[in-house]
Amino acid sequence: MFSYYFQGLALGAAMILPLGPQNAFVMNQGIRRQYHIMIALLCAISDLVLICAGIFGGSALLMQSPWLLALVTWGGVAFLLWYGFGAFKTAMSSNIELASAEVMKQGRWKIIATMLAVTWLNPHVYLDTFVVLGSLGGQLDVEPKRWFALGTISASFLWFFGLALLAAWLAPRLRTAKAQRIINLVVGCVMWFIALQLARDGIAHAQALFS
């Protein structure tokens, strides 16, 4: 059964490693050392719920409801554009230290709300967990399916906690004005690139719905 566990671990790692909204947010919270462990835990728990839903049958709901998929897609586009704009605004600020200090004033609940939006308004998360993991894990028997799910969940927990702790450890080097400008520019570009990709997918889905 360990072979199924390591298959899930490898696939989960491959899907979670690329820089996306979730990883960027966890990394930034780690650099700020601001509730970064809590955010890593909440991201991992969110992934646990999504992975279990995808592997144990939830994928059918999303795939059979094109309107729900369209709603998630365009909600994700709007959020990513807003999040990217905030990153660009910080990067272009004449006094980036002051802009970063303003971000640090955010309360716990606002940070949690942003984390939930970054996770649950990202259609790529549903495609990864419901479509990819659902199609692969859903074909397995009950016991192998559990080990496969455990492997992918382990990848999420290891990655998010590792990323948060590594970012916090490197914080003194990454908190400089130059580093903050570069990080925010990269995050803004990635967020807008993903938003454009999602918008293209959303237009294709809309054309399919109304054709």
From Swiss-Prot:
Changing residue 160 to S: Loss of transport activity. The chain crosses the membrane at residues 39-58, 64-91, 103-130, 141-170, 174-200. Residues 1-38, 92-102, 171-173 are cytoplasmic. Residues 59-63, 131-140, 201-211 are periplasmic. Changing residue 51 to T: Retains transport activity. GO terms for molecular function: amino acid transmembrane transporter activity; L-arginine transmembrane transporter activity. InterPro entries: Arg_export_ArgO_enterobac (IPR023445), LeuE-type (IPR001123), Lys/arg_exporter (IPR004777). It catalyses: L-arginine(in) = L-arginine(out). One of its GO terms (biological process) is L-arginine transmembrane transport. Disruption phenotype: Disruption mutant is supersensitive to the arginine analog canavanine. Induction: Transcriptionally regulated by ArgP in response to the accumulation of intracellular arginine or canavanine. Lysine has a negative effect on the expression of argO. It is a multi-pass membrane protein. Keywords: Amino-acid transport, Cell inner membrane, Cell membrane, Membrane, Transmembrane, Transmembrane helix, Transport. It is found in: Cell inner membrane. Changing residue 128 to A/Y: Loss of transport activity. One of its GO terms (cellular component) is plasma membrane. Its main location: membrane. Belongs to the LysE/ArgO transporter (TC 2.A.75) family. Monomer. Involved in the export of arginine. Important to control the intracellular level of arginine and the correct balance between arginine and lysine. May also be involved in the export of canavanine (a plant-derived antimetabolite). The cytoplasmic N-terminal domain is important for ArgO function in vivo, but not the periplasmic C-terminal region. A pair of conserved aspartate residues, located near the opposing edges of the cytoplasmic membrane, may play a pivotal role in facilitating transmembrane arginine flux. This is Arginine exporter protein ArgO. It comes from Escherichia coli (strain K12).
